[in-house]
Amino acid sequence: MTVVTMKQLLEAGVHFGHQTRRWDPKMAPYIFTQRNGIYIIDLQKTIRMLDDAYNYVKAVAQDGGVFLFVGTKKQAQDAVKEEATRAGQYYVNQRWLGGTLTNWTTIQSRVKRLKQLKEMSEDGTFDVLPKKEVALLTKEMEKLERFLGGIEDMPRIPDVMFVVDPKKEKIAVHEANILGIPVVAMVDTNTDPDPIDVVIPANDDAIRAIRLISGAMADAIIEGKQGQDDSEDVEKEMADKAAAENDDEESIEEVVEKSED
């Protein structure tokens, strides 16, 4: 069973690539044809590769993986935030701050500052400070929230990064490559697919296309996490059963001892 149907892909415009003069030759294997100066992506390959991406993401989620969704272009901002949040994961949908991954310790210090400012605003500290100082602190808090709010609670460097438009997010992709973090990405006809570990050939400019693919990745995480929960339940049940059997064995021994007495 496919993750999405051909009809869904067509309706979302996933097949529309870039103008033929703006292309990366390495994407040739994923191009079906060209029409009116626009490359048309081979959706048969998109379906197959999206299924592969779905299964990969689901497997990582089932092992308790942490995911970071990245998409800072205007068309991607809402979908990236909403789908990452729906899956209980993390996101960057504003400007990528250089070193977000490769200088994680520094980023964590800024996240700590964000949490401190939030606490100050909630516990009444701002109420007793001069208005000018409060204005400066509020501005600082809003800026940090804008850039770091999506990773504020991320416990560690992600196990997988999902990217909308890796050409635009080349710094994020490069940092992931340096750290060996697998990258799953929507790759359009104007983008070099080589830095991407799991390629999903797709229009990365249309809002509906971004929403569809991002949603599929969120669904994969949710399904994987459900599988993890089920596995944990089974393990707990088996552990409880083993403990109960041990208790029974002890009870039998006690009975034998009593009978000998």
Curated annotation (Swiss-Prot):
Cystine pairings recorded for this chain: none
The record ties this protein, via Pfam families, to: Ribosomal_S2
Q: Where is the composition biased (Acidic residues)?
A: 245-254
Keyword Ribonucleoprotein listed? The answer is yes
List, in alphabetical order, the Gene Ontology terms for molecular function in this entry: structural constituent of ribosome
Can you tell which superkingdom this protein's organism belongs to?
Answer: Bacteria
Record protein name field: Small ribosomal subunit protein uS2
Mention one GO biological process in which this protein takes part, according to its record. translation
Pull one GO CC term from this UniProt entry. cytosolic small ribosomal subunit
Question: What species was this sequence derived from?
Answer: Lactobacillus gasseri (strain ATCC 33323 / DSM 20243 / BCRC 14619 / CIP 102991 / JCM 1131 / KCTC 3163 / NCIMB 11718 / NCTC 13722 / AM63)
Traced from the root, the source organism's taxonomic lineage reads:
Bacteria, Bacillati, Bacillota, Bacilli, Lactobacillales
> Is Ribosomal protein set as a keyword in this record?
yes
User: What family is it from?
Assistant: Belongs to the universal ribosomal protein uS2 family.
Q: Which UniProt keywords apply?
A: Ribonucleoprotein, Ribosomal protein
Which InterPro entries does this UniProt record tie to the protein?
Ribosomal_uS2, Ribosomal_uS2_bac/mit/plastid, Ribosomal_uS2_CS, Ribosomal_uS2_flav_dom_sf
Cite the residue spans of the region called Disordered.
Answer: 224-261
